[in-house]
Amino acid sequence: CKEVFFMKKNIIVKKNSVTYQIPPQNVVYMEKDLRRIVIHLSGMASSELVVYGSFHDLIPNLDERFLYCHRSYIINMDEIIIMSHNQILLSSNEGIYFGKDTYRKAQKTFEEYMQRKRKEFS
């Protein structure tokens, strides 16, 4: 993934010869669309950035807050508001739908993540 790299835990994205430094907490989720990655953002001037690349190159560099539970999505678990049945509702009011098996895996990973966070803050 030549257009995405990481430095000091920030995600650095190059698009049209402009370099963006994105704090991970500003990423709501990432969506794979053919050869493009659509990075959905909060707290920034633009609500999304589109770059060319693959999740395969991204995943090893993301911290534990990111959930890769479906071939088309990587979700920032800090942005999850509700998980129910086969849908995840995000802080951006966007819903992401999954099949039962994928949803169960995502729910388990999310619950483990939340338990670790509670331990850190107690």
Walk through the language-model features, giving the residues of each:
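Basic, polyanion-interacting recognition surfaces, primarily
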Residues: 1-122
